[in-house]
């Protein structure tokens, strides 16, 4: 399913990659330059990043699996004890295959890949897709984690899981984390998330993900929700795992019912 055309400012600050190259890459994904957009996709020498030009203090959004919070989470996080690991059913030597159908910036998927799961990513928004692709390509070159990520984490060239064939593209687990409107006042929402939400908005068609997810999942579908959100599709899960601010609603696949 092709995403409708996205207009955003395209800027190159790179000495190696020209604006023409960035524009051509974006055109392949139905992204066009729109000079009045407050959002900009910027190519620097280091990476591709998203900025909100009218709120520069919010900083840039980019995908970084190698340093920063992801490095800390990989080295000092809970690993198998993390809530997402328990929710997808990691236990003992059991490492389920996973399709993350709302990949976003890839953080939960990275945690699962670091533990040893093979994770395939699907991202519906073309700008986020390019940010994710850029972050993955950089991480694949890393001496410490590059080889592991090449084996365990890949971005599929589709923009919706309904493009996948349940007969050949199935996985043990399908993971869904659709964007949900924040209850807090915007000042309390993390800066990065404010930029991200301005681009993506709330997932108004999130309910359309559950049925194809159930068709693709051999064992379970896991839906991450804010603790105050209703069930996806209004459908009662088989059980839920609750954390401080979220819950994971778990729907067992047909083979597990």
Swiss-Prot record:
Reaction catalyzed: guanosine(1516) in 16S rRNA + S-adenosyl-L-methionine = N(2)-methylguanosine(1516) in 16S rRNA + S-adenosyl-L-homocysteine + H(+)
GO molecular function: rRNA (guanine-N2-)-methyltransferase activity
Record's keyword terms, sorted: Cytoplasm, Methyltransferase, rRNA processing, S-adenosyl-L-methionine, Transferase
Pfam families, per the entry: SAM_MT
Disulfide bonding pattern of the chain: none
Major location category of this protein: cytoplasm
Localisation: Cytoplasm
Superkingdom assignment: Bacteria
Gene Ontology CC terms: cytoplasm
PANTHER family: RIBOSOMAL RNA SMALL SUBUNIT METHYLTRANSFERASE J (PTHR36112:SF1)
Protein name listed in UniProt: Ribosomal RNA small subunit methyltransferase J
Natural source organism: Haemophilus influenzae (strain PittEE)
